[in-house]
Amino acid sequence: ANTDGYTIGMITFELATYKKLGTSELTWENYAPLCRVNTDAAAITVGAKWAADNGITDLPGFIDYCKAHPGEVQMGGSSNASVWHIAGGYLMSATGIDIQMITYQEGAATAVQNAAGGFIQGVTVSLAEARSFIESGDLICLGVMDEERNPVFPDVPTCKEQGYDITYYTQRGMAAPLGVDDAIMTRLEEACAAAIEDPDFVTFMNNNGQAISYLDAQGYADYLKQAAVDVAAAMDAVGL
């Protein structure tokens, strides 16, 4: 792409999977990070009836149940090798449990519907995607894989609060092509920082249950470097 600063793009979670899947040789190192804009954490959400029938009220109870019933619990994500499919692998690698990750080529919405209907035990998708069924009482969220609680669901604890150091989320950020002049990069970074604080943008994100999680250029680069390692381990756990 042209390096005059007028062409920038968005980096998403999927970039971390391309090389391991053989889709592309591209990695985050092929771009110049500008800022991280948003993260959307995976959450461990299960069918309310199934949880009640098995006395599960929190994340430790769910983990204990999975350890007592290895390979029996079916959790849905989305399509194969997608962010929420890999979230299940991260959950397994972080806790030592063995669950079946069911993929849905139609996407997370179908997985959520199947969990609400009792066809699978739960899902490892975002709170935003499971929101309507959580609010209806068909699903309950046992924990969110984030550093802090989701402001839309303040009563849902993080995994860390319950003794499990698990953070995992999809992410979206801005990047420029390699080779953009330093002075132009600085202007772009400043513009990103200002845009993040725009009241209309903040309102839009809050109304849609999307977490603003800004990182500057260096912070975003550090994050992407570590995420590449973490995602590779999670992919191994689901056989990718």
What does each model-found stretch correspond to?
Residues 1-7, 20-110, 171-204:
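Hinge/capping helix and adjacent helix->loop/strand transition within the periplasmic-binding protein
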Residues 3-4, 20-32, 97-100, 133-144, ...:
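Ligand-binding "clamshell"
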Residues 6-10, 43, 121-122, 141:
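Short, Asp-centered acidic motifs that coordinate Mg2+ and/or phosphate
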Residues 13-15, 39, 49, 128, ...:
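Solvent-exposed coil/turn segments that connect beta secondary-structure elements
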Residues 72, 76-156:
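Ligand-binding pocket segment of bilobal, Venus flytrap-like solute-binding proteins
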Residues 129-197, 226-229:
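C-terminal lobe and pocket-closing loops
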Residues 186, 197, 201-222:
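Mature extracytoplasmic/periplasmic domains
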Residues 216-240:
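Extracellular/periplasmic bilobal clamshell ligand-binding domains
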